[in-house]
Amino acid sequence: MRRRRWTRSSRLALLLGSIALLLTGCSAHDAEKKLRFGWPTGVTKQAEEMRVLWTWTGVTALIVGVFTWGLIFWACIAYRKKGDELPKQTKYNLPLEIFYSIVPFLIITGLFYRTIVVEDDVNKLSKHPDVSIQVDAFKWNWQFEYHSYTDASGTVLQPVYPGQKHVADAAETKGQIGCDEASSNDSYSCGAPGQQGAANGPLYLSTNGSSDEIPVLVLPVHESVRILEHSEDVIHSFWVPEFLFKRDVIPYGTTSTGRDNQFEFTATSTGSFVGHCAELCGTYHSQMNFEVRVVTAEQFQAYLNALAKYPPGDKNYPARQSLALKAAGMSPYATTTHPFNTDRTARSASQNQGS
């Protein structure tokens, strides 16, 4: 009997030692990577919240699975046939039935609650985001209009190019450039797309993509950004894969104020990321790309100031976006994607160049 106990203890110690040895060989980074369970790496605060929900859902499923399979194997071994004697036939076990009815319900309730909490956080709109940007989608490109930027000191920056009066002076805005704050639904009404003026939007702080130049959406890291979406023709969809989030851009003008989807996020990593239209919208849908460039607050402020120096439509500054990016110390052109070829007969760029 003593030898038997010693054998069981030795086996248990060997098992625990093996587990400890395996754990010591895993770094914190490796453990975090394994706990992702295939979840992609995001670059926003909201993406990390979704990752945590996914991780704990997977851990919960593993615990339930291990417990369930453990009971199955235990029953198979402990109650295996040991002779010709017919085992005692049992039925009804009230405590057990209550257990496996209540516990799954509690698990589902907990997961449902956490899902609702994370979903609300992802869709939450703050009263005063650090940056407010209007995104206009059209076949087959994008236009970005910077409506406001509040720096770390709480100052609302309103750069203008020489000879133009502050848009905010004419619009009498409440911390927003060219936008009126609507207290009824905690959103912003910025006028119809394409009709930028003193009261509709900051024309001098907009960038417009074309078949020759990819539009670059420059954003500050670790600051809240609100995106207000407009579509001038059909349904599009704003999607940046690294954000792990997309939202449809509905055609403007379905009501008196238009239907403007909006959302907020906070980027946590600097870098350049390609954005796409994720809703089939016509011939060049697959090439309707843009670039998101997350930079430091200093670079972002420098970019806005530089962009304001070059009036849109000025023949002396045809590539104002490139000039502003270069002035802020960044690559003047997109690095994650390239402009599309409007020649529908060309099969590839190389063939088109060689013809």
Regions found by a protein language model. Give the residues of each.
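Alpha-helical transmembrane segments
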Residues: 65-79
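Non-transmembrane, membrane-proximal soluble domains of secreted or membrane proteins
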Residues: 27-54, 76-355
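Alpha-helical transmembrane segments of integral membrane proteins
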Residues: 58-68, 100, 104
